[in-house]
Structure formats: structure tokens, C-alpha cells
Amino acid sequence: MFSLQEICRKNIYFLPDWLSEHVIQRLGLYWEKHGSLQRIGDDYVLIQQDLIIPINEALRMAGEEGNDEVVQLLLLWEGNIHYAIIGALEGDHYSLIRKLYDQIKDCHNILPLIQDPKTFEKCHELDESCNISCLVLHAVKNDMLCILQEYKMRLSGGDIQEVFETACRSQKYDIVTWMGENIAIYNPGVVFDIAFDLMNVSLLSIGYTLLFNHHINNMNENIDSLLAQHLEWAAGMGLLHFMLETLKYGGDVTITVLSEAVKYDHRKVLDYFLRRKNLYQEDLEELLLLAIRADCSKKTLNLLLSYLNYSINNIRKKILQCVKEYETTIIIKILWKRKINLIGPILADFIGYHSYTYMVDFMREFSIHPEKMIKMAARESREDLIIKFSKNVYKEPKDRLHYLKSLVYTMRHKEGKQLLIYTIHNLYKACHLESKEMFNLARFYARHNAVIQFKSICHDLSKLNINIKNLLLECLRIAIKKNYPQLIRTIKTDMSYE
């Protein structure tokens, strides 16, 4: 429970001028050798009605003086206890240190606030469970190189490796450089791994400096393969500045390297090096095929095509194979706009296994007439697509029937034509045709040698007690003229019953 005095001390923001020094002291708002203390907002204090300083700076000063009473007042005003501990460490007031430290039990959050190496060490010693390795790790994180220099001989090989990696990840360039130049590190090459992980070209540059200027161990055995690997990594990540930094020390941007840029669609990397390298036609073609397989953007595909002058004769079949295998149409659209039409060859493959929704989008994207889609669906035995595309053209079954009949006349594919006729007959079954329309449909079947459908519609007409003798005679003439033996036999059989 707070006393009334503490509540007043915590919340008072204004001291009347008429208050005497004695009253201020009795209120606990007096700082010996400094004067009265007054809270200004949440972050500042006013000393002796004259000097305004941050509350945490006042805490550090009070801690350095060992003034527990002022420290407690400032903590009441929501100052940061860490600054009080720092001040107490600077003034070697260990009883105050212990009193304050017991409230937090962890020194590591204080360390980033400390600038002085000696105070840094003393603060870390407050945690009796920590060792030298822990001290050095935190020193590295907080740019205390001098502490690392002091304790380097007391670190094991594993500790040194951990400290080096910490310096790299914390991007403490001076410490990374000093360690690379002065301490034997088990795996110094980790600097490159971390540089790529953080995408930090400064670390990469330091790694190369250590490798080439100081010949640090374990890194100079196969420099060519190391540089090649770095170029591939950088190309795959789109890090052009990494590639340029690496090339200062050697290496070459090969097709393997450019393939990584293509695979991950890094057009700027590609553009930069394609402008500066004279690649063979075959290499450019391979990069284009890889870009298709990787589903690269239009800009990347256009870039590669531009270096091929949009000439794809040598790889036409391979492009179609890639489009089919990876179900991508971007390249087809780009070439189509350049008057290079690959739609026909790929349409049959796509319509053979893709859904109606997909094919509708494909049709709209490339402005394909529904008639072509229906005929191709018939060739590929996709009755479901025939029904859906024709329904999209005409909603009414009768209209669809007449529309499909018109397509049969121009359909050359035998099995496709048969499927269209089969679909037409199913539509007929769902319609209510007048006898005249049924006669016309029977003649249509006769013209196209659709024996089964012809027999079916004649049977339907007979059930309606409609005389079909003249129809059979007319259709017989058609069958004889077109030389349809099976249809001739069927008609003659039907005529025998009339």
C-alpha cells in the first residue's frame, strides 16, 4: 500500500514557489547537493527550478552517487531501473547494486545501455551463472572489441566460432575483420553464408578481403569453385550487387549462373549480363525453355525472345512440349501477339484434359471462336465440352441442335463427326420437334450415314403414326448416291414394314 506521502510524491508535477527547502526535504523531493526535484511530464525532471534532464540520466547520476532515496523517488516516477544500476556500477555502490539487481535478476538487458567496457564487465559479473564466453558474446553484440581482445586467449575453438558467427550476424564489421586477421577460426567461410542469408554485401566484401589479402585458413583450397557457387547463389537470389562484388575477385557468369537467374525470374540480373555477353543461339534457346518451365514473367520471356529476335523455329516442338507439360500459356500469348501462332498445335492437347472453365479462359484470352473449340472437343472425344460450349452459344436445345448440325457439314475428322451426331441425337431426345423438323433431321442422318440415329428417329416417327414411306424413298436415293451399303439395307428393311 502506498502512503499518502508516496502518492503525493508520485503524482505531484508542480512545486509552489513559497515551499521552503525544509518542507521540500520533508516531502522527499530534495536531492542533496543538487536541490529540489520536480517531475516534468513522464520523461524529464526539473532540478532546483533551473535544470531539466531526462529522468533516466537523473537515475544514473543518483545511482553513481549511491543516493538510494533519490533513486527510489525517480523509480516512483517510472524511470528505468537499468540506468540506476549502471550508475551504481560506475560509482561502485555494491549495496545499492544488489538491492536494485535483486528486482530484475538479469544483467543482459542492461548491457546494450552501457558504453564503458569496465562498467560492461562489472555488470555482466552480476550474473554468477554466466561465463567468459557469455561475456564475450554480449561484448561482440554491443561493439566492445576491447573485451574480446582481453579475453581471446581464454576462449575455446568452439567459443571462437560462435563469437565469429555472432559478430557476422550482428554485422559488427570491425570485429569480424579483426577476428579474421588475428584469430584462428575453424570455419571462417561462414561469413559468406551469413552474408547471403542477410543479403549483406559489406559482409561479403569483408569475407573476400580476408580470403585474398589475409589468406585465412580453410578458405583458399578451391577458390574457383567457391566464386562459381557464390555467383550461382547471387543470381538465384537476384543479388546483382553481390555478383558484381564477386566478379572483382574472379569467376565467370556462365550459362549455369544465368540459369539460376532465369529459374527464379530475376530479369534485371539477366538483362545486365545478356547485354555484356555474346551468347550462342543454343544457349539462349535453353534459357528460354527454362524460363517457360519456370513460369517466368512476360518481361523475362520477352527479354530472352528479343535476344533470339523472336526466332523459335529450332525449338518450336520443345516449346509446345514445355507448354503442355507445365500448363503455361504466357509464351503462347507473347508469340501470338508477334504473329507466331502456336495455338492450334497446343489446343488439342489442352482440350484433351483441361476443364471447361480453364478452356473458356483460354478461348477468351486468344479470341478463339466457339466453333473451333467444339470441333476440337469432338476430335478429342470430350462430349462434356461439346455440350457446355454449344450451350454457351445457344441456350435453347433446338437452337443448339441446329447449330451442331451446321458444324457436322464442315467436320472432317470421322470420329469427331460421329460424336457430334451422337450429341445431336441426345439433344433431339430432349426436344419436342415438329414432324417436319424430324423429317429434316432424318435426312441429315442419311446424308451423314448415321445409321443408328436414322433408325431411331424413323422408329419415333412410326410410333407417332406418321407415314414415312416418302421419307424412306428420299433417304434411300441419298444412301445409293453416296454409296452407304449399311444404310441402304436398313432403309430397305424399314420399307418392308411400311
Curated annotation (Swiss-Prot):
Lineage: superkingdom: Viruses
Pfam families listed in its UniProt record: DUF249
Induction remark: Expressed in the early phase of the viral replicative cycle.
The UniProt record lists the keyword Lipid metabolism: no
Sorted UniProt keywords: Early protein
InterPro entries, per database record: MGF_505
Role, per record: Plays a role in virus cell tropism, and may be required for efficient virus replication in macrophages.
Family note: Belongs to the asfivirus MGF 505 family.
Name listed for the protein in its UniProt record: Protein MGF 505-5R
Native species: African swine fever virus (isolate Tick/South Africa/Pretoriuskop Pr4/1996) (ASFV)
Phylogenetic placement of the source organism: Viruses, Varidnaviria, Bamfordvirae, Nucleocytoviricota, Pokkesviricetes
